[in-house]
Every structure is written in C-alpha cells, then in structure tokens.
Amino acid sequence: MYIPSARTAIVQDDKGGLKIDRNAPMPQPRPNELLVQVKAVAINPCDHKMYERFPTPGAVDGCDFAGIVVQLGSDVKTFQIGDRVCGAVHGSNPSRPESGTFAEYTVSDGEFTLKLPPNLSFREAMGLGTTGLSTIGMAIYKGLMLPGSPLEPAEKPRTVLVHGASSSVGTMALQLIRLMGHIPIATCSPRNFELVKKYGAEEVFDYNDPECGQQIKQYTGNTLAYIIDPFTDVKSVALCYEAMGRAGGRYACLEMYPEFALERRSIKVFFALGMALLGHSLDLAYGYERDEDPEMRSFGIGWYKVLQELLYQGKLRPHPLRELEGGFEGILKGVQMVKNKEVSGQKLVVSLE
C-alpha cells in the first residue's frame, strides 16, 4: 500500500494556537504500533487544553480517531492491513510531537486500539469517545475501586454519581456503571435530563440548582460514597462534596483538583488522567506529569480487551453526534466551539474521508 512521505495535519503554531500544515512529517510506527489512515476524528476539551497548557510548536493536535490500518509495527500480531479501527492517542505531546490524530495519518499503540464491528461506522465510533473510555476505566477501577466488570456484574449494587453526565464521557460512564451492576445517578442541565436517562441514569438532578447537593444527599439517604467529576473546578468539587454521604467515600476527578479538595480526609481523591493509561512517562507539569507505570499499562491493556468485547457485543451506544463539514477547517472550528463551551449533549465529529 502506498504511503506518502508527508501528510496534512493540524499542528500547534508559535502563537499559542493551531494551524493547518500541508507538509507535516509522516510518523513511523514503533514495533508495537499501527499506522492508521484517519477517516474521522472527534473533538474533546483536551484538544484545546493541551496546546494552551503545554505549548509545543509543530506538535500535532487531536486525541480520538477512527480509520484504516495501513502499516504494522514489527511486533504487531493481532491486526492486519485494512482493519477498521478506532482509538485514542496523546495529542500535542511534547515528548512525541508527531503523534496527534488531527491528520491524514496517525500512529496508535496496538494494545490500545479497538477493531470496529461491521455495523459501526467511523463517525459512529467517534461517538464512543475513546479518550473518555480510557479515562472512565481508570476512574471506575483505580479511583472508585468499584467491584464487578461490564462483562461480570457485581452482586451488590452501589450508587454512583456522575456529575455533568450529558457529555460523551458522562454517557459512557453511565452505561459502563450500569453494565457493572451498579446504579448511576447524574447531574446535568434540565434540557439534557431525558438524554441522560436514556443512557442509564436512575435519577437526574439540575446542577445549576443551589440545592442540588442537598437534593442528592436526601435522595441517597446521606450514604453516597462514589462520585465521578469531569469538571473538577471549585464549583463542581463543592457540589460533589456536599452530595457525598456522611461517612465520606471516593471521588474520581478528570482534571487536576484544587487544593481544598484534599481537606476532607474521609474523601479519597483520585485524578484520572486518560493519557496515563498507556503507562508511559508524561513530560508535563502542573500535576499532569507521570512516571513510567508498567502496572497501569497492564491494567489499561486489560481494560481495552473488555472494551473490545463490549463493542463486539454491541453493548455500548455512541453519544449523539454533531458532524462538522469542512475537513481540517471544520476541526479548527470545532476546537474553538468546544473551547467556547458552545456544545451541549453532543459529540463533535469531523469526517476526513
């Protein structure tokens, strides 16, 4: 199969933003990696946060992708050229600037790449939010330490609060928690109540209501012990801690937490950083840095095997999509829309076919 020597990609510029590079270098897959021709991408908050927090001119942005395998690393045994796949990588990575997904081609670790079933299109696969699936797996098992598996549900259900559940991360968390045999409850804006219930929430609360925390506490009988918080700002931490039961519990956040989050000793805080699931060291800062972690990598490989089986069984329903036209120009527009908080209850997807 012909592979060009260069590709079009969206890279960081030297002014703290993004630009389209029509002559970006073609990445070479390492022994355990795949080279994928990208057919669709999804846009995540991390796609603007990475270049804002960790400026690296020339680094390719983007984390989620779906496409076709065009080249195999020397150690890859479980994929073939032509396989339809999806996955997530560390975009705008200072340690590997060529690795983002907003490009005609990207590289992906074979252990963290999912094969698409025939009935799932590239666009629909992006509704799964593969970056979010990585993060939620870490939050559920390493942060909340919930028993059970989506393939072998727990015998005794726990109630789990998913704060801000109308995002793709939220709807995937709701489904996975249900599959594990637990009871998800949720917060979101009232306009998304029905959406969140369709994805498995037992009860939903308005996170803009000043009494939201107390309402959750009353609903759970002051016994709530498990919370996932994608926002992790001062307001969300305060709400989640108000909702937490008298005895405390486990709080898994998806952003770096403010210092006061550690003041309530009965609450165990865990920062679930999805890009750390691969077990590689992260040359970042501000609490996002990580040492190499073979145990986390082993866990991540096992989690992706579970996700692959769930895909084959058709047990994960993609988040509602909003497709943007314009290819790479559409991606730039979408990143700005997410940055400006113009998206609610939908996953922005751009086709590159």
Swiss-Prot record:
Gene Ontology MF term list: nucleotide binding; oxidoreductase activity, acting on NAD(P)H
Binding site for NADP(+): C46, D47, H48, K49, S189, P190, R191, N192, Y207, L254, E255, V343, S344
Gene deletion effect: Does not impeair avirulence in Pi33 resistant rice cultivars.
Induction: Expressed exclusively during fungal penetration of host leaves, the time point at which plant defense reactions are triggered.
Entries under InterPro entries matching the protein: ADH-like_C, ADH-like_N, GroES-like_sf, NAD(P)-bd_dom_sf, PKS_ER, Trans-enoyl_RdTase-like
EC number from the UniProt entry: 1.-.-.-
Chain sites annotated for binding substrate: T131, G132, L133, S134, T135, I136, G137, M138, G274, M275, A276, L277, L278
The family this protein is said to belong to: Belongs to the zinc-containing alcohol dehydrogenase family.
Function summary: Trans-enoyl reductase; part of the gene cluster that mediates the biosynthesis of a tyrosine-derived cytochalasan acting as a fungal signal recognized by resistant rice plants and leads to avirulence in Pi33 resistant rice cultivars. The first step in the pathway is catalyzed by the hybrid PKS-NRPS ACE1, assisted by the enoyl reductase RAP1, that are responsible for fusion of the tyrosine precursor and the polyketide backbone.
Name under which the protein is recorded: Trans-enoyl reductase RAP2
Originating species: Pyricularia oryzae (strain 70-15 / ATCC MYA-4617 / FGSC 8958)
Gene from which this protein is expressed: RAP2
